[in-house]
Each structure stands twice: as C-alpha cells, then as structure tokens.
Amino acid sequence: MESPPTVPLYKPRLGGENLGRINAINSALSALFAAIYAIGVIMLAPISFMPFQVRIADCLMPMAILFGWPAIIGLTLGCLVANFFGGLGYIDVIGGSVANMAAGFIAWKIGLRRFHGSWFVATIVENLTVTAIVGFYLWFILAIPDVIINGIVVPGLAASWAGIFMGSLVAINALGYALLRILSRSSVIGPLRSHGLRVYTKEE
C-alpha cells in the first residue's frame, strides 16, 4: 500500500491586496500622528517653543514604542510642519524633525528588547535624545547667555538643556508614558490588530 504523498509545509504570504491594505493603514496612521502633533504644537505655541517649553504634543513620542515606523514617520513630519510655523528658522525645522525621528527610533528599538522596565527606560532615553539635540541648537540660534544663580555660573547650554529636559519630563515621561500604558491594554490593541495594524507589545 502506497503511503500518501507528502504535503509540503506552506507558509501563507501576504497577497498584493492585503499588502496594499496594510500599507494604506500605516500611511493613514502616520498622517494621523503628523496631524495631531502639528495641530497640538501650533495651538499651544506659547508653551511649545523656546528653551523653556512644555510641548504637550510630545506626549505622542512614546507611541513610537507601540506602533514603530508609522508613528516615527508621523511624529517627524508633524514636527517639521509645526516648527515651520514656529518662527525660529530652518535649523529648528530640520533639527526638531531629526530629534523626533532619532528619539522615536531609539525608543522603539529599546522597547523591542522587552526587558523589565524597557518601556520606562525607552521614554527616558527619548527625553534625553530630544534634550540633547533641541537644547543644543536652541542654545546656538538664540545665543543663550550664561546665567548666575546664587553666585554660581550656569552655562547657557546647560540652562537650555535643563529647560528642554524639564518640559520633556512632563510631556514624554509623565503624560506620554501614561498614554502608552493606556493604549497598550488588550482592549485597545485587540481591535487595532483586527484591522491589520502592527502593534508592538511586551507580550509578543
């Protein structure tokens, strides 16, 4: 009696239609992040620019940990548009966009490591990346002078970094981390995944 023919293992591939749908979803998500970020910065312009700022829209930065490239691209484009209206020139437009892309990418990669506390560490590094880049070029283009506090000379660059760091501590590490925890709940990511959206969670 002949044995039944061996059926080769088959790994399904995404067809052109499904791949196109996923690309459309990712593009829409990037556009959504870009729009919300830009609108948030422009509407809250008085507290979103200069060395001492609390850019509330930066609460979206940790979303790069959860959504990867669609969020990174959206936050980069959103910053580019927002900073164009900020009045600080092309250095702010380019520098802020680079800061968002670098911070988002690094945070996403740290989040993918999935060690205990990886998301918290990722948001701290995100803050430090934004602080280092934005604080430096704002010090440069605004020529921030040294300041004297209680007889101690504080370099202008240090003051600029401190201003950005404290604002990002509120926007990224407090508001953003809380938003990240809320959106990572199964009740939220379940419907997103059912529509073909890739979500990176600690459980994967």
Residue ranges and their predicted role:
Residues 42-52, 80-204:
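Membrane-embedded alpha-helical hairpins and interfacial helices in multi-pass inner-membrane proteins
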